[in-house]
């Protein structure tokens, strides 16, 4: 097992105009670990995954992959593969042709690159000669995973890999990721599904408004019973108070109505 970290990020900041997508993010991922990124839409998960894949560069902070500092060039770091916002596929090509084209870009033919092997790993052998334009979302996700596996990555980066998967497809993908981790590959994935995180991840990082609010073992998160405060802006504060009062484990910690232009409540849960 490698002793160096697959990913080491310190103080990573990324802005898009006036929008701060990542604000001082730290992240450690070890080899053989499946690390989940969790958070609401707009939390910064996809931006962080894009940095790991070389699709963007941080404005500040330090990012190391496999112990090597990531430079300012837009390039996929060595040993890294994956996708964000869904895999990029050629819709007019078959599944096999898509993978063969990717192999050719790396100077390999389909046989030596192991195209048939990765198709089998993700359960697409029976549709290998079907055009990608007819694939369901789940099939496209699995083909994207197969494309990443062609490179035999040491770090696999996946954005919502379970999207669109039926139970059989999810079992297949989970099996692939678990096996890769057992072989020493680091996997970083985002997911909105707690069942995916519980089934796959040993560590999770929770992002909110571009900041890390928790990072550590999933078991520690499950045992964490700290209360959190949420500031809610509402046009119906009376109804919100009644709803909070009638919900077990939820209460109004502060009433900011009248102190702001909009009615606001701080709800503790």
Where do the protein language model's features map onto the residues?
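ABC transporter nucleotide-binding domains
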Residues: 4-7, 14-209, 214
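ABC transporter nucleotide-binding domain
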Residues: 174-268
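Intrinsically disordered, low-complexity segments enriched in small/polar residues
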Residues: 9, 15, 30, 34, ...
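C-terminal coupling/interaction segments
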Residues: 3, 268-269
């Amino acid at each position: 097992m490698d002793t160096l970290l697959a990913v080491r990020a310190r103080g990573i900041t990324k802005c898009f105009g006036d929008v701060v997508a990542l604000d001082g993010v730290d992240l450690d991922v070890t080899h053989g670990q499946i690390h989940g990124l969790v958070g609401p839409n707009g939390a910064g998960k996809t931006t962080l995954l894009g940095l790991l894949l070389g699709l963007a560069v941080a404005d500040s902070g330090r990012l190391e992959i496999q112990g090597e500092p990531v430079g300012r060039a837009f390039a996929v770091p060595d040993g890294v593969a994956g996708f964000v916002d869904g895999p990029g596929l050629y819709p007019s090509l078959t599944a096999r042709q898509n993978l063969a084209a990717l192999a050719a870009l790396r100077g390999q033919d389909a046989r030596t690159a192991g195209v048939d092997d990765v198709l089998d790993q993700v359960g697409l052998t029976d549709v290998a000669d079907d055009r990608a334009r007819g694939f369901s979302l789940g099939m496209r996700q699995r083909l994207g995973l197969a494309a990443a596996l062609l490179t035999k990555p040491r770090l696999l980066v996946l954005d919502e890999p379970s999207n669109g998967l039926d139970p059989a497809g999810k079992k297949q993908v989970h099996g692939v990721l678990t096996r890769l981790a057992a072989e020493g590959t680091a996997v970083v994935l985002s997911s909105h599904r707690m069942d995916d995180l519980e089934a796959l991840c040993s560590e999770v990082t929770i992002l909110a408004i571009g900041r890390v609010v928790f990072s550590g073992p999933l078991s520690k998160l499950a045992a964490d019973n700290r209360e959190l405060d949420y500031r809610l802006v509402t046009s119906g504060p009376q109804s919100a108070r009644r709803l909070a009062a009638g919900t077990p484990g939820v209460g109004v910690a502060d009433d900011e109505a009248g102190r702001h232009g909009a009615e606001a409540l701080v709800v503790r849960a």
